[in-house]
């Protein structure tokens, strides 16, 4: 997390907390399906989150803008960007297999 804060000191405490919660969530999901490479978990923030946030240095999304992340895979760069830009609408799209599994898990969780 220090790495994220080093390059993005403007992040609010709420945003930092959300970024801090990402790794445990990915570890949990990675134990069920291969969301991201398991060998990358040790470098989660540098290889995935920081890499996704590098877009911020090149392009600034405006409040209310709608962004489509096609082929999002494990949710990168869409999820980190959605945390960074809370007033921008992000839609993440991936294969039917990935979406179906996620939908099934969400349905099972809701039913229990």
Show which residues each predicted segment covers:
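N-terminal auxiliary segments of SAM/dcSAM-dependent transferases
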Residues: 1-24
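Conserved Rossmann-like nucleotide-cofactor binding loop
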Residues: 98
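Conserved small/polar residues in nucleotide/adenosyl-binding loops
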Residues: 102-111
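Conserved SAM-binding motif I beta-strand of class I
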Residues: 89-94
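Conserved SAM-binding loop of SAM-dependent methyltransferases across substrates and taxa
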Residues: 74-86
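Conserved class I S-adenosyl-L-methionine
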Residues: 64-71
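Class I SAM-dependent methyltransferase Rossmann-like catalytic core
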Residues: 36-42
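Conserved alpha-helix/loop element of class I SAM-dependent methyltransferases that forms part
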Residues: 46-63
